[in-house]
A protein has these predicted regions:
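Short, well-ordered coil/turn residues that connect adjacent beta-strands
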Residues: 167-168, 178, 197-198
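Iron-sulfur cluster-binding cysteine motifs and their immediate structural context
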Residues: 81-87, 175-192, 205-218
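Primarily a LysM-type cell-wall glycan-binding module
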Residues: 164, 171
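Short pre-active-site segment immediately N-terminal to redox-active cysteine/selenocysteine motifs
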Residues: 75-78, 169, 199, 209
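Cys/His-rich short segments
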Residues: 152-163, 182-195
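Redox cofactor-anchoring modules in respiratory/redox and cofactor-processing assemblies
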Residues: 1-162
């Protein structure tokens, strides 16, 4: 009820608590007490006290990459575990969202996280892996889909999106083709158009310019 609920009545997915190095909590953890010990037990922390609520359209792998990118840039570089460990974790996450991940990456992420949490010199380093660890534990299936199926269920990771045109909805107006920067869309006026996936750069211009909602992603 706080803040009016989730926009457009979309489904709740997770809430990230404690700032950039805080953990992500799922629906079953929403009744957790907001105190240090209670949050520590479930892999989160009070931190800055900020809450980021995420709906069903959020990619949890990208969330982990986003926060790891932030903390990696904030690392002072004084200690090796934080400086190099967060860099390695970020590289792995970037591979996964790009569709180049391997199943062994998940074990490596957890091993790196454990090492950083136990050996980093300051609070930033010790808490930096929390967004990654918490999302792997709660949303491992999403990580596996990115790695094995090369699919982002939220449609957020552009490298994993496949753009298609629904022939039933397409009116053949050619707006998508005219606005495609790489000429990947062809067809005849008043007939369904098609997308050449070998040329498509997944910019999303076709979706933005289709007045009939005929372009979609998988």
């Amino acid at each position: 009820d706080i803040g009016g609920g989730i926009k457009d009545d979309k489904g709740f997915k997770a809430v990230q608590i404690g700032g950039p190095s805080g953990g992500c909590l799922v629906e079953s953890q929403l009744d957790s007490k907001m105190d240090f010990d209670s949050l520590s037990r479930i892999g989160a922390m009070i931190g800055s006290g900020g809450l980021v609520v995420m709906d069903e359209d959020t990619c949890m792998v990208e969330v982990a990459r986003f926060f790891m990118n932030f903390t990696q840039r904030e690392s002072c570089g004084k200690c090796v575990p934080c400086r190099e460990g967060t860099k390695r974790m970020l590289e792995i996450l970037e591979r996964i969202v790009a569709g180049n991940g391997e199943m062994s990456d998940l074990d490596e992420l957890e091993e790196l996280a454990d090492m950083i949490e136990n050996t980093a010199l300051c609070g930033l380093g010790k808490s930096a892996p929390k967004p990654v660890v918490s999302t792997i534990h709660a949303f491992r299936k999403e990580y596996e889909e990115h790695i094995v199926d090369k699919k982002c269920r939220a449609g957020v990771c552009s490298n994993l999106r496949v753009f298609k045109i629904d022939p039933e909805k397409c009116k053949g107006c050619s707006k998508c083709a005219k606005n495609c920067p790489v000429n990947a869309i062809t067809g005849k006026i008043k007939s369904p158009f098609t997308i050449d996936h070998s040329k498509c750069i997944k910019c999303g211009s076709c979706i933005d310019n289709c007045p009939f909602g005929a372009v979609y992603t998988e």
